[in-house]
Design a protein with these regions (language model features):
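Solvent-exposed loop/turn segments connecting transmembrane beta-strands
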Residues: 54-58, 79-82, 182-183
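An acidic-aromatic
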Residues: 71-120
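Bacterial signal peptide processing site
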Residues: 17-20
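Solvent-exposed helix/loop surface patches that form functional interfaces
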Residues: 111-140, 144-147
Length: 208
C-alpha cells in the first residue's frame, strides 16, 4: 500500500476496556461534562468495519479514519472491485482517490462517495457520531445513560444507537454504533482507537 506523506500523528494508545451499556436516565450534568471532553478531541485515528444495507444491496467495508482538526483522511476497503477509495479533505472540499489513481473532487463527501462507488454512507455525520457527539449540522433529540454518554440520538431522518463503549486513555468512546433511516442501515464497529497530538509517525504505516 502507498505510504501517505505529510500526515502524521503522535499516538498515545492504551488497551481498550469494554464498558457495558447501562439503562437510559436523564443525567444532564454528566452529559455536559462528557460532551466537553469529546469536543476537545481534535486528533484521533480509528480502525474499524462498517456494514451498509439499503434494502436491496449490502456492502461490508474496512475503514481507517484519521481526523486532525477539520482535516481528515479516510480509507475504505472492500466493495470497490477488491480495491480501496481514499477520501481526503476538510469542511470546504474533499478529494476521492481510487485504487486506479483517479481523482475526483466535490464539496459534499456523501454525494461524492455515492456517485463514484454506489455506496451510501453518512460520512459527514459519522465524523461526530463516531466519537459520541451529535452532528452540529442538524437538530437532534438525544437520550443519555447514567454515565452521561449518548445511548440514542435522532438527527433528521437518522436514528443512531450506541451499543457499546470502550475506555481509551481516560476517555470513553463508542465501540459499536447502529444508524438507520427509511432506506438505509449502517452498522459500525471500531476495533481500535488511537489518540494524540502533534506529528511524528504516519498512523497509516502500521496498517499498510
Amino acid at each position: 500500500m502507498t505510504k501517505l506523506p505529510g500526515l502524521a500523528l503522535l499516538l498515545l494508545l492504551t488497551a481498550c476496556t469494554i464498558v457495558e451499556e447501562v439503562p437510559d436516565s436523564l443525567n444532564t450534568g454528566s452529559w455536559q461534562a462528557h460532551q466537553a471532553s469529546l469536543q476537545g478531541m481534535h486528533h484521533w485515528f480509528a480502525t474499524g468495519r462498517a456494514a451498509i444495507n439499503n434494502g436491496t444491496e449490502s456492502w461490508h467495508v474496512n475503514m481507517l479514519w484519521l481526523q486532525q482538526g477539520n482535516n481528515y483522511q479516510i480509507r475504505l476497503f472492500g466493495p470497490f472491485g477488491a480495491g480501496q477509495v481514499q477520501l481526503t479533505g476538510n469542511s470546504d472540499q474533499v478529494e476521492l482517490l481510487t485504487s486506479d489513481n483517479e481523482r475526483f473532487y466535490s464539496h459534499n463527501i456523501d454525494t461524492l462517495l455515492y456517485e463514484r462507488t454506489g455506496v451510501k454512507m453518512p460520512v459527514a455525520e459519522l465524523r461526530y457520531w463516531l466519537i459520541g457527539l451529535p452532528s452540529p449540522a442538524g437538530k437532534d433529540a438525544a437520550s443519555v445513560d447514567s454515565h452521561g454518554r449518548l445511548s440514542r440520538l435522532q438527527q433528521g431522518e437518522w436514528r443512531v444507537r450506541y451499543k457499546r463503549y470502550v475506555s481509551v486513555n481516560g476517555l470513553v468512546l463508542p465501540g459499536k454504533i447502529f444508524a438507520d433511516k427509511k432506506d438505509l442501515d449502517v452498522r459500525v464497529v471500531i476495533d481500535e482507537w488511537k489518540l494524540g497530538i502533534q506529528t511524528l509517525n504516519n498512523p497509516f504505516n502500521d496498517k499498510g
